[in-house]
From Swiss-Prot:
Name the UniProt record assigns to this protein: Large ribosomal subunit protein bL20
Role: Binds directly to 23S ribosomal RNA and is necessary for the in vitro assembly process of the 50S ribosomal subunit. It is not involved in the protein synthesizing functions of that subunit.
RNA-binding listed as a keyword: yes
Keyword ATP-binding annotated: no
Keywords: Ribonucleoprotein, Ribosomal protein, RNA-binding, rRNA-binding
Source organism: Kineococcus radiotolerans (strain ATCC BAA-149 / DSM 14245 / SRS30216)
Classification via Gene3D superfamilies: 6.10.160.10, Ribosomal protein L20
């Protein structure tokens, strides 16, 4: 049976891991075992944070929309409710962009949302609402 030589493959594997670990501090960029552990962990972080980034941006957009809506005298919750009632389908990313770059257009959307909201009945005095 022929002898199997794997030195080239092993060296290539180690070189690849050490290249991925370049820029890390200390042993994590120089020693193969430490570098392999750190590269694996880094890839896990990268995967997790790619997923988390989507939620982070959504939270940022909601904060921007809420701030702009409150400047117009309306809360975020009522604003979104009014947009749904007016059958306006604009995603939060575009609403946040409008709030930052074109406040006049955002104000028009707020007025439309206010007009579409039903007026809440006023509770009679002395009764719990």
């Amino acid at each position: 049976m022929a002898r199997v030589k794997r030195a080239v493959n092993a060296q290539k594997k180690r070189r690849t891991v050490l290249e991925q670990a370049s820029g890390y501090r200390g042993q994590r960029s120089r020693l193969y075992r430490k570098a392999k552990e750190q590269v694996t962990h880094s890839l896990v972080y990268a995967y997790r944070d790619r997923k988390a980034r989507k939620g982070d941006f959504r939270r940022l957009w909601i904060q921007r929309i809420n701030a702009a809506a409150r400047a117009e005298g309306m809360t975020y919750n009522r604003f979104i409710q009014g947009l749904k009632a007016a059958e306006i389908e604009v995603d939060r990313r575009m609403l946040a962009e409008l709030a930052v770059s074109d406040p006049a257009a955002f104000g028009a959307l707020v007025r439309t949302a206010k007009a579409a909201l039903p007026v809440a009945p006023v509770a009679a005095e002395g009764t719990a609402a």
